[in-house]
Structures are given as C-alpha cells and as structure tokens.
Regions:
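Short C-terminal beta-strands that terminate individual repeats in beta-propeller domains
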Residues: 37-39, 76
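Blade-level signature of beta-propeller repeat domains, shared across WD40, Kelch, NHL, RCC1
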Residues: 93-121
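Short loop/turn segments that connect beta-strands within beta-propeller blades
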Residues: 29-34, 68-72, 120-121
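Extracytoplasmic/periplasmic copper-protein system
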Residues: 78-80
Length: 121
C-alpha cells in the first residue's frame, strides 16, 4: 500500500493518523507500518486533530469541519475552503489549513481570509 497525497499526520494512541487528500481518507498506521482506513469518502481532507476519542477533520475543498466518532461523521462548522488552483503544478485547494485542539476549543487556520477560527467543542 501507500499514500496518494498525504497532507497531515498526528499521533493517535500508539499509532499515527494520516489524512490523504487524493484518496479522501484518514488512515491509521501502526508501529509495524500496517494501514487501516478509519474514515473514507472525504473531500480533500487536510487537517486532523483529536479530542476525547473524536477525530476532527478539515476538508480543503468544502471548508467543512467534520467530527468522526464511533463510526458516525457529522459537520460541526464551515469555514472558507482551501486555496484555488494557482497553476497546473499545484494540486487543487492545497495551501494547508491547520487544526489544533486546546482546552475545549478547536482552532482552524484559514489562509484565504488570513484568519484563525475558534470553535467550542
């Protein structure tokens, strides 16, 4: 196996979670390198963050912030989507929008609006 277009990686329990923009997946990678698709069917997932076993995902093409928990996915917010294509060499919407969790808030960087969004969890 392999990744098509990995965009973000974070620690998750003893493993890693990787967002793959091209496949539309969040993939769990264990210490031995084995991969397991955790979330599928996303539209250009870029940023990922974890809080209380929930996985928060930023979709670059839609600007949606999604929450994945126990097999269920829901939209919790929408911000400006990622950057438009600037040239044939740049993939669609690919100036990264980062996610971070601090206390009971999710922070999202938005490059088109030059903003830092804060969402209460």
């Amino acid at each position: 196996d392999g990744f098509m277009a990995p965009t973000h990686v974070i620690n998750y329990e003893e493993d890693l979670l990787v967002s793959d923009r091209s496949s539309g997946q969040i993939i769990r990678v264990n210490k031995q390198g084995a991969q397991e698709v955790i979330v599928d069917g996303l539209d250009s997932p870029e940023g990922i963050a974890i809080k209380d076993n929930a996985i928060y995902i930023f979709e670059g093409n839609t600007g949606q912030i999604k929450k994945y928990l126990e097999g269920q996915i829901s939209i919790i917010a929408e911000v400006m989507p990622g950057s438009p294509v600037q040239s044939e060499l740049q993939p669609p919407s690919m100036v990264f929008n980062g996610l971070a969790v601090k206390d009971n808030y999710l922070y999202i960087s938005g490059e088109l609006e030059r903003s830092l969004f804060r969402i209460e969890l």
